[in-house]
Amino acid sequence: MWVTLCPAAAYRSRARQPAAIGIWRALRRPLFVAFVLGCTMSLITSAGLTPRLAGSATVYWSFVPLAEMVGLAAACGRGGRTLAFPRAIDLFFAGHGPWLFWLIGLSAIWSFTPPIRAFALTNAIWLYGAGGVALVWSAYIDFCFFRFALARSMARAGRDLVLHRLISWTIILAIFGGPAIPPAVAARLGW
């Protein structure tokens, strides 16, 4: 929670702490992100948390944290590395608070409101309003990660943030929207 509320101070402090961590500690936060995504899908589709839906959705939505780790590897691999990569993964995923809160809110809307009202709330208010806030706040947190945890200059931290987002979001969009993108592009081009 500290990283979500005070990312600069949190990353400054946590980056100085000695931590040789193992693979489990490096992967626990990405696995938690995948788990929250899986639970969100279960709650949206059935208005209930069922192990069958949440478990399978966790597995197939695990590409999101994997894509983020690919982007993180590319951004961390540029220049000198100040943190071991497992530690960088753990610290980076500690900053996923805005997106996790957004997903929990989305789940609550779909679980506690009728479908017609849920569509209205998620289209106008939640996707654009709260989603925009989560996007901007998470970008700031990620910038603080690159700036303070990896000890980068402001310009370098900004470039690393853009590189990470470009790589990870391109992978996520290609996997999630891949089947729908070519027909939509063809329709816009009049093919």
Region locations from a protein language model:
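Juxtamembrane boundary at the C-terminal end of a transmembrane helix
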Residues: I171-W191
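Selected alpha-helical membrane-embedding segments in polytopic membrane proteins
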Residues: M1-D90, H96
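Alpha-helical transmembrane segments of polytopic membrane proteins
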Residues: S56-V64, A124-L135, G190
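Aromatic-enriched hydrophobic runs in primary sequence
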Residues: R29, M41, T45, T58-V59, ...
